[in-house]
C-alpha cells in the first residue's frame, strides 16, 4: 500500500507541476484579449 500511495503522490505532483509550468509559460500579458478565462 505504501508503494501505491507514493505512486499516486508522484502522479499528482507531476500533473500539478505540468499545470503550473504550462500556466507560467503561457504568459497572459501577451494575450490581453483572451476570452477563455471568463
Swiss-Prot record:
Specify the superkingdom: Bacteria
Keyword check for Nucleotide-binding: no
Q: HAMAP family, per this entry?
A: PSII_PsbI (MF_01316)
Assembly mode: PSII is composed of 1 copy each of membrane proteins PsbA, PsbB, PsbC, PsbD, PsbE, PsbF, PsbH, PsbI, PsbJ, PsbK, PsbL, PsbM, PsbT, PsbX, PsbY, PsbZ, Psb30/Ycf12, peripheral proteins PsbO, CyanoQ (PsbQ), PsbU, PsbV and a large number of cofactors. It forms dimeric complexes.
Known role: One of the components of the core complex of photosystem II (PSII), required for its stability and/or assembly. PSII is a light-driven water:plastoquinone oxidoreductase that uses light energy to abstract electrons from H(2)O, generating O(2) and a proton gradient subsequently used for ATP formation. It consists of a core antenna complex that captures photons, and an electron transfer chain that converts photonic excitation into a charge separation.
Q: Which GO terms describe its biological process?
A: photosynthesis
Q: List locations, semicolon-separated.
A: Cellular thylakoid membrane
In its UniProt entry, the species of origin is given as Synechococcus sp. (strain JA-2-3B'a(2-13))
Q: Note the topology in the membrane.
A: Single-pass membrane protein
> By which gene is this protein encoded?
psbI
- Answer whether the UniProt record assigns the keyword rRNA processing to this protein: no
Similarity remark: Belongs to the PsbI family.
Keywords of the record = Membrane, Photosynthesis, Photosystem II, Reaction center, Thylakoid, Transmembrane, Transmembrane helix
Any one annotated GO CC term: photosystem II reaction center
Q: What is this protein called?
A: Photosystem II reaction center protein I
Q: Which NCBIfam families match?
A: PRK02655.1
According to the record, the segments passing through the membrane are: 1-21
Amino acid at each position: 500500500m505504501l508503494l501505491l500511495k507514493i505512486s499516486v503522490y508522484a502522479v499528482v505532483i507531476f500533473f500539478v507541476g505540468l499545470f503550473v509550468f504550462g500556466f507560467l509559460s503561457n504568459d497572459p500579458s501577451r494575450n490581453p484579449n483572451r476570452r477563455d478565462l471568463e
